[in-house]
């Protein structure tokens, strides 16, 4: 797909910790699985809204390495939902110019899901409107540790080269904003390297409730902030003291 739009790495990179599916369902007397199903609908809404709001890369935290400790039935349901999403959304992603990448370990995923991931990535490889990264069996600390092990064999190393080892791709824009839903205020091992200078936005909204308006609110908050990346803002010179 060819396009003359702004290159994706010149647009915002937003990461979202999609939290609150289970609590959303419990408050409504529904099963936790129903909450995860509603969470998939929220993904569709935000993937559609993101390019319209200046986002070029969207990284969604779907399943952490620690989530394997959840009840087996819930994990199985999550894997089924992932496979369903991959199988049913690919045509829509291709149509809308979305390139899908799944980050995290794949060796522990069911074989059918690993194959579905590879197929979806191939099918959407030419998308140039939005880069959608879904983190599955993901740990930022593990990603950094694995990158360090690979870097040990190199004779020289730059920050850019190490970043490529961590993220698995060259030229990925650092994360500008990390959003977490459900009112929790922690990063939970998400994008620790590429989000080193990311702004943080926490909302009480549960992920199944999150919509384009909530995304716009998070981006408006981000735009009001002054990002100094460790430096100082320009301050007026103080007058010299009188002698």
Predicted region positions:
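Flexible, compositionally biased loop and terminal segments
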Residues: 1-243
């Amino acid at each position: 797909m060819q396009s003359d739009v702004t290159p994706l790495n010149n647009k915002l990179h937003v990461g979202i910790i999609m939290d609150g599916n289970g609590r959303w369902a419990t408050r409504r007397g529904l099963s936790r699985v129903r909450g995860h199903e509603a969470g998939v609908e929220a993904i569709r809404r935000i993937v559609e809204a993101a390019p319209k709001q200046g986002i070029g890369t969207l990284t969604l935290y779907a399943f952490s390495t620690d989530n394997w400790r959840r009840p087996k039935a819930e994990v199985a349901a999550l894997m089924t939902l992932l496979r369903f999403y991959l199988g049913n959304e690919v045509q829509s992603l291709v149509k809308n110019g979305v390139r899908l990448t799944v980050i995290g370990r794949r060796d522990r995923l069911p074989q059918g899901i690993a194959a579905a991931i590879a197929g979806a990535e191939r099918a959407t490889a030419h998308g140039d409107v939005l880069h959608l990264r879904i983190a599955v069996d993901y740990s930022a600390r593990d990603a950094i540790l694995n990158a360090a092990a690979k870097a040990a064999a190199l004779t020289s190393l730059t920050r850019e080269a190490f970043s490529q080892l961590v993220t698995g791709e060259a030229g990925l824009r650092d994360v500008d904003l990390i959003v977490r839903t459900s009112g929790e205020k922690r990063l939970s091992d998400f994008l620790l390297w590429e989000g080193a200078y990311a702004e943080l936005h926490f909302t009480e909204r549960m992920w199944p409730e999150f919509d384009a308006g909530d995304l716009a609110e998070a981006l408006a908050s981000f735009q009001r902030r002054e990002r100094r990346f460790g430096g100082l803002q320009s301050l007026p010179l103080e007058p010299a003291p009188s002698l």
